[in-house]
């Protein structure tokens, strides 16, 4: 029996402890190379971001602080849907069978979560830059808002990546994404807007550490659910 066949047989059973940093790094490198070669996807998202921000500028000019904050997170949400939700939907059946034979499900899902988190950190930074250039800079604490935007982008990417993994197994993935995503995304988006308000003034917001801890705890829960549930989806 060849080494490839032995590896395939070892990886097929459901395993919750088979986490390999080397395999995760290899899969992450694969996603980065594909993104680099298919640059039309990345630049398509950039065009969407730039056009959305420019339309907001033409419509509203320089909005007030709360409106600026809300528009930023709503824009980031739709960018995340376009950038992250396709991560599993673009994988064909043949490619998924190939991955099924050579890697464990935990390594596969973790590589997707890491890649999408890095992608959304980049998009969060670009979104913030465009908003500050076109819609003004109402921020009092720019670095704080930048950190929160990266954390928020990662949080949104984790949820949508997990939902995309579930929806990819359904016959109507877009409908499944909408049905499952609405009750999860809306509370998270409202929480991000509330946390980000502190970056617009010098007033200390009560309970801010608890809100950030709640957001981080939600992210950890999503990672844990992906770690536990994705192997069963993978086997199916």
Model-predicted segments: where are they?
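Aromatic- and glycine-rich beta-strand/loop motifs that create alpha-glucan
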Residues: 15-44
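Transmembrane helix boundary and interhelical loop/hinge segments in multi-pass membrane proteins
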Residues: 35, 81-99
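Hydrophobic alpha-helical transmembrane segments of multi-pass membrane transport/permease proteins
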Residues: 39-61, 73-77, 180-191, 217-225
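Membrane-interfacial helix-loop-helix connectors in multipass membrane proteins
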Residues: 59-63, 67, 129-150, 175, ...
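Long, hydrophobic alpha-helical segments
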Residues: 70-85
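Selective transmembrane-helix segments that form parts of the transport pathway or gating/packing helices
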Residues: 105-132
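Junction motif at the cytosolic side of a transmembrane helix
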Residues: 133, 219-236
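A structural motif at transmembrane helix-loop-helix junctions in multipass membrane proteins
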Residues: 150-182, 234-236
């Amino acid at each position: 029996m060849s080494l490839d066949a032995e590896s395939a047989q070892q990886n097929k059973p459901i395993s919750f402890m088979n986490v390999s940093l080397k395999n995760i790094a290899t899969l992450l490198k694969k996603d980065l190379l594909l993104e680099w070669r298919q640059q039309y996807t990345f630049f398509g998202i950039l065009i969407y971001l730039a056009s959305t921000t420019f339309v907001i500028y033409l419509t509203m000019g320089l909005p007030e602080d709360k409106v600026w904050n809300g528009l930023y997170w709503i824009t980031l949400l739709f960018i995340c849907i376009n950038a992250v939700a396709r991560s599993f939907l673009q994988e064909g059946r043949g490619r998924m069978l190939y991955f099924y034979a050579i890697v464990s499900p935990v390594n596969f899902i973790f590589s997707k979560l890491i890649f999408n988190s890095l992608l959304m950190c980049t998009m969060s930074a670009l979104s913030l830059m465009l908003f500050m250039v076109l819609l003004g800079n109402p921020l009092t604490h720019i670095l704080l808002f930048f950190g929160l935007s990266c954390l928020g982008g990662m949080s949104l990417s984790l949820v949508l990546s997990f939902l995309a993994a579930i929806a990819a197994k359904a016959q109507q993935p877009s409908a499944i994404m909408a049905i499952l995503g609405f009750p999860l995304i809306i509370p998270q988006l409202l929480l991000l807007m509330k946390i980000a308000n502190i970056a617009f003034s010098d007033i200390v917001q009560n309970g801010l550490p608890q809100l950030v801890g709640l957001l981080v705890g939600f992210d950890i829960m999503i990672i844990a659910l992906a770690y536990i549930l994705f192997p069963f989806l993978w086997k199916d």
